[in-house]
Amino acid sequence: VPWNANEQVEQDLIISRALVAIFSDDFLASKLAFRGGTALHKLYLSPQPRYSEDIDLVQIDAEPIKSTMYRLGEVLNFLPDRVTKQKRFNNTMLFRMESEIPPTVQIRLKVEINCFEHFNELGLVKIPFSVDNSWFTGQCELTTYRLNELLGTKLRALYQRKKGRDLFDLYKALTLHEVNPDEI
């Protein structure tokens, strides 16, 4: 994928490594599902047509989030400068680091857990995911949503906010894949 800047390549590798860390952990893999633009681009649209800079997760079951947040902090301990923000319906971990490739710039990673929407319509699936480069090699199965359900959340997002990326994501997915409109 032709990213515009070296730090975007670094951030994309950090996202991939974080996903492997999260979903290689049996506890977290049973508690969290991966969704959002990053899920759509990493799992269903290849090559990635757009840069995505965060990890959106959903708490699978309605239960206290404290132990999940604690474990998430443990498995992401390779990332520096963690700030945790807890709200009623979502919990966020923010990480800040400097890029390794000059010129040095700030890279941030946001990992957000939606603690409100515990349902899914089409059932969760596990999709193999791997990273293989000189910086990090690892693999896991990501717990996520089926393509049509991810597209449904993108369609809903069009009604809730005005961000061109949602329309772009829908366009790319609909032109690259056969989808069932009734499921969306």
Stretches found by the model and what they are:
Residues P2, N6, S16-V20, F27, ...:
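Catalytic cores of NTP-dependent nucleotidyl/adenyl transfer enzymes across multiple folds
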Residues E7, Q11, T68:
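Hydrophobic (often cysteine-bearing) scaffold residues that line and stabilize catalytic clefts
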Residues A18-L28, R71, V75-L79:
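Generic non-transmembrane alpha-helical segments
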Residues F23-I55, Q59-I60:
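Active-site nucleotide-donor binding segment shared across nucleotidyl transfer reactions
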Residues Y44-Q48, T68-R71, I107-L109, G123-V125:
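Short, conserved acidic/polar surface loops in the N-terminal third of protein domains
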Residues L45-P47, R82-Q86, R96-P102:
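Catalytic micro-motifs at enzyme active sites that drive phosphoryl/nucleotidyl and oxygen chemistry
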Residues Q59-M93:
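Metal-dependent nucleotidyltransferase catalytic core
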